[in-house]
């Protein structure tokens, strides 16, 4: 739980409904007050075109135990979306120096999870190094299978929206 406490205290970019900066707040306060932050979603593919899906640990504050279609997280105060994406991909999956492509942004609005989201993709066949505090397991599957599984398994709705934005682009 030390990781969760440190994560909750992290200063996060606070924005309005048009993604204009308003300042920074601790992650937990942003969530508890229903305010809007910025998030990144990095869809990691292998060279066979399979998508890395990860199961979130049960200690996560949002969607514990759910399958996630993207690495990523909250953008820190003063941090550009692209820098956040590169940082999160390395922290969560151990992938560094991958070429990131941005595919667009969307506003996700659900109680306890209000975000302006930037969607990126990367391709890598490097071995994964999972961040144990955040990810309990990972596997590569076809993106279509992930969408099919999401009908019966718990998948994060924000990363589902990120994948749909990517597929529709």
UniProtKB/Swiss-Prot annotation:
For whether the record's keyword set contains Magnesium, the answer is yes
Q: What is its EC number?
A: 3.6.-.-
InterPro entries xref list: NUDIX_hydrolase-like_dom_sf, NUDIX_hydrolase_dom, NUDIX_hydrolase_YfcD_pred
Gene3D superfamilies with a match to the protein in the record: Nucleoside Triphosphate Pyrophosphohydrolase
Alphabetically sorted, this entry's keywords are: Hydrolase, Magnesium, Metal-binding
Which cofactors must be present for this protein to function? Mg(2+)
Q: Which residues bind Mg(2+)?
A: 88, 92
Q: Which GO terms of the molecular function aspect are on file?
A: hydrolase activity, acting on acid anhydrides; metal ion binding
| Superkingdom in the source lineage | Bacteria
Q: Where is this motif: Nudix box?
A: 81-103
Nudix hydrolase domain: residues covered: 35-163
**PANTHER family, alphabetically?**
ISOPENTENYL-DIPHOSPHATE DELTA-ISOMERASE
Family the UniProt entry places it in: Belongs to the Nudix hydrolase family.
Question: Can you say what this protein is called?
Answer: Uncharacterized Nudix hydrolase PA4841
Where is the organism placed in the taxonomic lineage, from the top? Answer: Bacteria, Pseudomonadati, Pseudomonadota, Gammaproteobacteria, Pseudomonadales
């Amino acid at each position: 739980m030390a990781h969760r406490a440190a994560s909750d205290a992290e200063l996060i970019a606070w924005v309005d409904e048009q993604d204009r900066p308003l300042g920074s707040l601790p992650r937990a306060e942003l969530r508890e007050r229903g305010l809007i932050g910025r998030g990144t979603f990095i869809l990691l593919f292998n060279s066979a075109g399979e998508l890395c899906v990860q199961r979130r640990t049960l200690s996560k504050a949002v969607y514990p135990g759910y399958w996630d279609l993207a690495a990523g997280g909250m953008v820190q105060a003063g941090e550009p979306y692209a820098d956040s994406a590169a940082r999160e991909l390395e922290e969560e999956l151990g992938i560094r120096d991958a070429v990131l492509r941005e595919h667009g942004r969307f506003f996700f609005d659900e109680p306890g999870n209000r975000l302006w989201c930037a969607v990126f993709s990367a391709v890598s066949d490097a071995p994964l190094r999972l961040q144990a505090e955040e990810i309990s397991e990972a596997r590569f599957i076809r993106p279509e299978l992930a969408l099919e599984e999401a009908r019966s398994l718990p998948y994060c709705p924000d990363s589902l929206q990120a994948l749909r934005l990517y597929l529709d682009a």
